[in-house]
Amino acid sequence: MRCALALSALLLLLSTPPLLPSSPSPSPSPSQNATQTTTDSSNKTAPTPASSVTIMATDTAQQSTVPTSKANEILASVKATTLGVSSDSPGTTTLAQQVSGPVNTTVARGGGSGNPTTTIESPKSTKSADTTTVATSTATAKPNTTSSQNGAEDTTNSGGKSSHSVTTDLTSTKAEHLTTPHPTSPLSPRQPTSTHPVATPTSSGHDHLMKISSSSSTVAIPGYTFTSPGMTTTLLETVFHHVSQAGLELLTSGDLPTLASQSAGITASSVISQRTQQTSSQMPASSTAPSSQETVQPTSPATALRTPTLPETMSSSPTAASTTHRYPKTPSPTVAHESNWAKCEDLETQTQSEKQLVLNLTGNTLCAGGASDEKLISLICRAVKATFNPAQDKCGIRLASVPGSQTVVVKEITIHTKLPAKDVYERLKDKWDELKEAGVSDMKLGDQGPPEEAEDRFSMPLIITIVCMASFLLLVAALYGCCHQRLSQRKDQQRLTEELQTVENGYHDNPTLEVMETSSEMQEKKVVSLNGELGDSWIVPLDNLTKDDLDEEEDTHL
């Protein structure tokens, strides 16, 4: 698309018949009268509303015929103007609260030296002592070629007196700005700037009108229109930067949104950038336009500084643009130490019956801040909660300072605890029954569920099985013991029975023992045992018999 536009512009340049150069004349020519706009534009133009800024630029230059070899070298250099800022004290820029009158910016090309001159005139009448004075600064540039109405080619060496002037009328709106300190750097009337080539668009000598309002910005040019809503900045200077042979890039120092083209068939593409593009090789010095959130700063030859955004609220309307400042109320002093903080408040009237905790400090109060205050706050928080953990606990203390003394009243101590989800789950797990009564039906933490589902399903049957087996083992042991005792008793009884049968049959090993026949004379004798018990058995040990019995037995036997 851009290549097609460049080719069409080149064909237009080649198809134009060459015109003879006009001789320089000290008197103003009709082309000069047509192209020159007087600086007293405020008398000829209708008064503009306070919310709008109108820039009128008249340009009636026609195509200039140059050889084909120089078609790609149509250049014009623009010198960046330097804004001088005067203030009451160094390093401070004070913007006017209300400025009335137009600000005239005249760009005059030609003259005795043949160099274009840029002049900025500041308004004389102000309504406030705190004003920003824009010093008049003149910068000259040596153009390669200039164009006039009749299409003749004028060079810088011709020394012609024909002028090509552009008058810009600016009306600033009523606005109140804060005083912002800025570092100042020495300014010189002329600073070395690098020239920027500008490609001259093909035009038929129409008047160009560019109008910028506060609520909606409109750039009106015959053939195409650009619209940008919500523009509140004042356009002081426009810098044209060469992009290609048939392309123009419109750069402004304020923050302007990119404008979209609404018509087709134009030979020059215009782009509005959001900030001034600056490089160290092409533009060592730049000019800054004041906007609603920026203040004018003196620029040094190497850098262009931008002021930080002022703490204010912008309110724009279709009729007037106003700036409203919000000054925050003075907050109560708060001392913050990592996660702990102490807030001081005014002492309120309390009833006599209410008891207050009063701390009389020897050093600085808790409202002043310091290392001792951090230690004191930590001690108070640990006293309130024994398990105070700074990693997950935040302690806040509300104090009331007594004016004229170092006494503070402790009104409230708050400790916020941030527990991990796992700790909360473990604590709620122990109170699951109460949670169910309160209306909680389920609780999950990842794969873990309520305590009932987390328990072992086989725990109760296992316990029952173990108890049953233990009882069975005890029963088996009891039966074994009973059976073993019975068997032993039976064996003893069988042995005694066999002995009795042997003795009764006369088969015994002791020859002295002999079974005597029972007679009426012989009575059963009861032998006293060794332990003093009477013996019921007929079988009596031989040792228990007396000597007399033994003699009688022997005699009887014989």
Curated annotation (Swiss-Prot):
Chief site of localization: membrane
Residue spans of biased composition, Polar residues class: 32-50, 83-107, 143-173, 190-204, 270-302
Topological relation to the membrane, as annotated: Single-pass type I membrane protein
Annotated Low complexity bias: 125-142, 313-324
UniProt modified residues of type Phosphoserine: 529, 537
InterPro entries: CD34/Podocalyxin (IPR013836), PODXL (IPR017403)
GO CC terms: apical plasma membrane; centriolar satellite; cytoplasm; endoplasmic reticulum; extracellular exosome; extracellular space; filopodium; intracellular membrane-bounded organelle
Glycan attachment sites: 33, 43, 104, 144, 360
Positions of region (Disordered): 20-50, 83-210, 270-338
Entry keywords, A to Z: Cell adhesion, Cell membrane, Cell projection, Glycoprotein, Membrane, Phosphoprotein, Signal, Transmembrane, Transmembrane helix
Location of Phosphothreonine modifications: 518, 556
Topology, Extracellular side: 23-461
Residues of the signal peptide: 1-22
Membrane-traversing stretches: 462-482
Post-translational modification: N- and O-linked glycosylated. Sialoglycoprotein.
Family: Belongs to the podocalyxin family.
Name of this protein: Podocalyxin
Organism: Homo sapiens (Human)
Gene expressing this chain: PODXL
